[in-house]
Amino acid sequence: MVHIPSDVTPPRLCVVEKLNGENEYGYNLHAEKGRGQFVGTVDPDSPAERGGLITGDRIFAVNGHSIIGENHKKVVERIKANPNRCEMLVISEEGAKWYNENNVQITLDLPNIERVSPMSKETPVFVPPPPPPTDAMPYLPRLAELNKGTPDQEFGFNLHAERGRGHFIGTVDAGGIGEKAGLEAGQRIVGVNGQLIYPTTGHKEVVALIKKDTMKTTLLVASEDVDKYHKDHNIAYSWDNVERVDTRPVINVETHHHHEEVSVPKSNGYDVPPLNPHSIQVNEEREISKMTTTTRTETITNSNSAYQYKESSTAYDAYATPPVDSNDLMDEVFGRVNLPGVTMSSHTEVLPPTDDISSVSSLSSHRESAVDVPVSHQYVPSYATESHQKHEQHSQTHHHHHQHQQPSPLSNGSSHGYAASSTSGYDDDDIYHLSAREARERLRMKNRKHHLHEMSLNEKYQLVSNM
């Protein structure tokens, strides 16, 4: 690369753009043999003046192409290639002398080219590129490093050139080397393998730089926003301030979240606590046993009557009433009153009469004497006081002496075989005119006094049935 002293006048890259409604660039183009193409008169406040053209400037390149040795007609064609915009590399007559004397061609590859803002109306002054800023720039060109694995691979992108605008990245192959390096469609190439690229750089030259190494290439590319930022702030591109792309493989880490939902049933609008998922709910089926008790009712008549007994079965639920833990006989008897699900069954057996009254009497569990009771009448025992029991014992002795006589009617019209009470129509020991509660209380008291725990099973049944 040619070393150019800093005091040498640099060439200027002037961008001439027409604004809305403008039809001319506002300058004249002259050609002289031995001088080449140069700028004639420049109209004030014209696109040419705003672009930095000065009368007498020599023209060395137009829209990225060198015009050295080209005729006037060819140069005009290049200028008119874009009717609204034109880039020209120019230098003053005095400034060109040093290059002629030192045999240095003025081309777009010179390192000291100065870019002129299109909106500037002042004569441009060369300012060396500023040092890299300490703070990160908001817009940086991207450094894309493309490396092939084998010679038969492709970089995976297309190169497009637009006259007067530069070289751009076209289609980028998905998953290719170019995409992995960070290339995107629409980026402008501003550098190739360490060398800056300008809009005036020839297309063949850019292609040659890319193919310089068949296995790898390094591109400096700028998106539309980055390019606009550099133009607006008159910032030259540099290989020192770049955005690097991390080409290391990305490891995708997937995190699986397992959420187990346990539905909680509701009962009557209230939340039920959730069950342990490891617990087992067991529905215990309880078998209800049945217990059957048999109660025998005996009826004893005289020797001429048939001996009858009734046997009834009562079935009740063993779990309906808990067992009575009491030594009181009456509690055990009345503890089974009003049992649910009680079924009654009965049958009557008639036994043939016997001549031996003593054998008949021995079958009875009653302590009272036998009396004449009609067959259709149900015998219900009643219990009298101690004096009444003595009277019955006397009556029993009387019956033994007259067992062959005809039985006489019951006294006082009592159908139970006992005399009725002489006061208020009821005997004090008669419990059948009392309520069930009063009867139980009176019998409980009598049991304590007269040891009624010797009652037969028949008497207990009759007593319970009449409650």
UniProtKB/Swiss-Prot annotation:
Residue ranges of domain PDZ in the record: 12-94, 143-225
UniProt remark on domains: The PDZ 2 domain is required for the interaction with the amino acid transporter protein aat-6.
Annotated GO CC locations: amino acid transport complex; apical plasma membrane; microvillus membrane
Cross-referenced CDD domains: PDZ_NHERF-like (cd06768)
Observed phenotype of the null mutant: Viable, with no gross anatomy or growth defects observed. Localization of aat-6 at the intestinal apical cell membrane diminishes as animals age, and eventually aat-6 becomes diffusely dispersed in the cytoplasm. RNAi-mediated knockdown in a pept-1 (lg601) mutant background results in a reduced number of progeny.
Protein name: Na(+)/H(+) exchange regulatory cofactor-like protein nrfl-1
Role: Scaffold protein that connects plasma membrane proteins with members of the ezrin/moesin/radixin family and thereby helps to link them to the actin cytoskeleton and to regulate their surface expression. Anchors the amino acid transporter protein aat-6 to the apical cell membrane of intestinal cells, particularly in older animals, in order to maintain amino acid homeostasis. May play a role in promoting fertility.
Tissue/organ expression: Expressed in the excretory canal and intestine. Expressed on the apical cell membrane of intestinal cells (at protein level).
GO biological process: intracellular amino acid homeostasis; L-amino acid transport; protein localization to plasma membrane
Main location: membrane
PANTHER family listed in its UniProt record: NA(+)_H(+) EXCHANGE REGULATORY COFACTOR-LIKE PROTEIN NRFL-1, PDZ DOMAIN CONTAINING PROTEIN
One GO MF term: protein-membrane adaptor activity
Comp. bias intervals (Polar residues): 407-425
Subunit structure: Interacts (via PDZ 2 domain) with aat-6 (via PDZ-binding motif); the interaction sequesters aat-6 to the apical cell membrane of intestinal cells.
Alphabetical keyword list: Cell membrane, Cell projection, Membrane, Repeat
PTM comment, free text: Phosphorylated.
S-S pairs: none
Residue ranges, annotated region (Disordered): 344-429
